[in-house]
C-alpha cells in the first residue's frame, strides 16, 4: 500500500527531538557498525565511565541516535547515556592476555541489534563502549559506532575524543573529584545535512547521477567468490562474519610506495585481484574491479560545510579496474594509475547521490535500483585504505550480519587498512565458513605484497 505524501511530518511536530528521516544513502548504513580499538596505559574502568558520561555529550555526534517510526529510521536527538550492560561493558573474561595476540585472533562480529534504549525500545543507540583490562599494565578500549554516524576516516575523529577522556583520567588518576565532575571537553557541533545529500555539493549536475555510470556497466557478471563450505542442513545461526587483523611495518611500506610510485590502496587491490585470478586460474587480462571508498570531502564540488565536516559518513565508491600485467610491480603501478584515473570523474559523488535516491523523500518508500556492482554476482572485490590515524596500535573493524537465507552465495569479503607512523594494520572481514583455499591464497598474496 502506497503511503501518503509526507506522512512522516506529523511525527516531527509531535516530537521536537526527531530531526529527519534517513535518506537512501544513510538508510542502509544503519545495518552495520564500525569499530575502533586501541590499547592504553592501565586506567580504571569506573573512572572512564564517570568521566565519559559527563564529557562525551559535549560532542554533538554522540547525541544522535536512530529512532524507528512505523519501522522507518529517523535521526533522533537524545543525549548520550552510558548504560551499563546495554551500551557500556566491562569485559573480564577475555582469553587473550596480550593485545597483539587479541588482534591476530579470529573474532566473531558481535550482533548489537539489541543495542536498544531500555526506556524506549524504538531507539537504537548509536554507540557502544567496551573496556577490558588486558594485563596489569594495559587497558583495551573498543568503541563501536553505527555506520551512519561515520565512515572509516571519521570514525577515528570520533575516537580521538575518547582518547582525550583517557588522557584526562590517567593524568588525574589521584583526583576523584576532578574525574567525577570536571567537564573539560568544549562543545563541538555536528550538523546533520539535508535529506538526499544534494546540498553538500556546489554546481552538481543532476544529470550526472540520474543515469548509471558507464564504469558500473563495465563490471562483468562473473561470480568471483566461492560458495561457502556449508550444506543446506546447517543451522543458519552458526553462520556469521568474523574479523582478523594483520600487522605490518608501515615505515618499510611507505618507503616502498614512494620509491615505486604506488600506494597502500593499490597494494590492497593488487592483493585481491591477483588472488582471484590465481584461485580461478583466470587469464591475466581478465578485468577485476574493486569497490574503493573515496572521501567526498576532498571533491572540488564539496561545499564549505562538507569540506570542514569531521563526522558522519561521506565516503563514496570508486570502481578502479585491475588487469594483470604479468609482474607484481607492474600490477601495483597499473592499479595505482587506475585509481588516479577514477578520481576526477566524480564516481564517488555519483555513488552517494544514486544511493540517496533509493528512498523517496515524500513517502519514504524504498526503490533500491542503484545498479551498483554486486560483490556476489560480479567481478568486484572490496578493499579500502582508510589512511593515517592516531593511536598506539589502533585497529579498525566492521560489524554486520550475514544474509542467513542465502549466505552460501551472497556474502562479502573485505580488507581495510589503517596506519600510524610505525604500523599498518589490515582488517579482514569474511564469513566463518569461507572456502579455506581461497582465503589462504589471499593471505599469501597479502604477505607477499606487504612484506616487500
Protein language model features and the residues they cover:
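Surface-exposed, Lys/Arg-rich phosphate-binding patches that contact polyanionic backbones
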Residues: 247-263
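Hydrophobic/aromatic-lined pockets within catalytic cores
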Residues: 150, 163-171, 258, 272-281, ...
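Non-catalytic, low-complexity flexible loops and terminal extensions
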Residues: 2-23, 149, 153-156, 161-252, ...
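Short amphipathic alpha-helical segments
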Residues: 264-273
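Structured interaction and signal-relay segments at domain junctions
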Residues: 77-91
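Acyl-thioester-dependent acyl-group transfer interface
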Residues: 1-75, 81, 95-126, 254, ...
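Hydrophobic (often cysteine-bearing) scaffold residues that line and stabilize catalytic clefts
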Residues: 44, 151-155, 264-265
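Histidine-centered acyl-transfer/condensation active-site motif
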Residues: 108-109, 115-169, 178-188, 417-442
Amino acid at each position: 500500500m502506497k503511503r501518503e505524501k509526507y506522512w512522516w511530518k506529523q511525527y516531527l511536530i509531535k516530537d521536537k527531538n526527531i530531526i529527519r528521516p534517513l535518506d537512501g544513502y544513510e538508510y542502509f548504513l544503519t545495518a552495520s557498525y564500525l569499530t575502533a580499538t586501541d590499547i592504553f596505559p592501565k586506567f580504571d574502568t569506573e573512572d572512564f565511565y564517570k568521566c565519559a558520561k559527563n564529557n562525551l555529550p559535549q560532542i554533538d555526534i554522540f547525541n544522535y541516535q536512530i529512532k524507528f517510526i512505523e519501522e522507518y529510521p529517523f535521526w533522533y536527538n537524545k543525549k548520550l547515556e552510558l548504560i551499563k550492560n546495554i551500551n557500556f561493558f566491562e569485559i573480564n573474561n577475555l582469553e587473550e592476555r596480550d593485545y597483539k595476540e587479541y588482534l591476530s585472533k579470529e573474532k566473531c562480529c558481535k550482533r548489537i541489534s539489541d543495542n536498544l534504549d531500555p526506556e524506549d525500545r524504538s531507539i537504537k543507540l548509536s554507540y557502544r563502549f567496551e573496556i577490558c583490562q588486558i594485563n596489569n599494565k594495559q587497558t583495551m578500549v573498543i568503541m563501536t559506532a553505527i555506520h551512519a554516524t561515520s565512515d572509516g576516516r571519521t570514525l577515528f575523529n570520533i575516537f580521538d575524543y575518547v582518547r582525550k577522556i583517557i588522557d584526562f583520567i590517567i593524568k588525574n588518576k589521584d583526583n576523584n573529584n576532578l574525574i567525577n565532575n570536571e567537564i573539560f571537553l568544549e562543545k563541538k557541533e555536528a550538523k546533520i545535512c539535508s535529506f538526499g545529500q544534494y546540498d553538500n555539493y556546489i554546481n552538481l549536475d543532476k544529470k550526472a547521477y540520474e543515469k548509471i555510470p558507464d564504469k558500473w556497466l563495465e563490471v562483468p557478471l562473473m561470480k568471483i567468490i566461492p560458495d561457502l563450505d556449508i550444506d543446506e542442513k546447517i543451522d543458519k545461526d552458526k553462520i556469521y562474519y568474523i574479523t582478523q587483523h594483520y600487522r605490518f611495518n608501515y615505515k618499510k611500506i611507505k618507503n616502498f610506495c614512494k620509491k615505486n610510485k604506488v600506494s597502500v590502496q593499490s597494494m590492497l587491490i593488487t592483493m585481491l585481484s591477483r588472488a582471484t585470478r590465481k584461485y580461478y586460474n583466470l587469464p591475466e587480462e581478465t578485468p577485476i574491479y574493486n569497490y574503493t571508498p573515496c572521501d567526498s570531502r576532498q571533491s572540488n564540488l564539496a561545499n564549505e560545510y562538507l569540506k570542514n565536516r569531521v563526522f558522519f559518513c561521506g565516503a563514496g565508491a570508486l570502481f578502479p579496474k585491475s588487469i594483470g600485467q604479468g609482474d607484481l610491480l607492474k600490477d601495483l603501478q597499473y592499479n595505482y594509475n587506475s585509481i588516479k584515473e577514477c578520481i576526477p570523474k566524480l564516481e564517488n559523488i555519483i555513488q552517494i547521490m544514486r544511493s540517496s535516491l533509493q528512498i523517496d523523500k515524500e513517502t519514504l518508500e524504498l526503490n533500491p535500483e542503484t545498479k551498483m556492482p554486486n560483490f556476489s554476482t560480479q567481478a568486484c572485490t572490496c578493499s579500502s585504505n582508510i589512511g593515517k590515524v592516531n593511536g598506539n596500535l589502533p585497529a579498525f573493524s566492521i560489524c554486520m550480519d550475514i544474509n542467513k537465507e542465502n549466505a552460501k552465495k551472497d556474502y562479502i569479503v573485505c580488507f581495510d587498512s589503517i596506519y600510524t607512523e610505525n604500523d599498518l594494520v589490515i582488517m579482514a572481514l569474511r564469513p566463518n565458513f569461507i572456502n579455506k583455499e581461497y582465503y589462504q591464497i589471499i593471505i599469501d598474496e597479502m604477505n607477499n605484497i606487504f612484506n616487500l
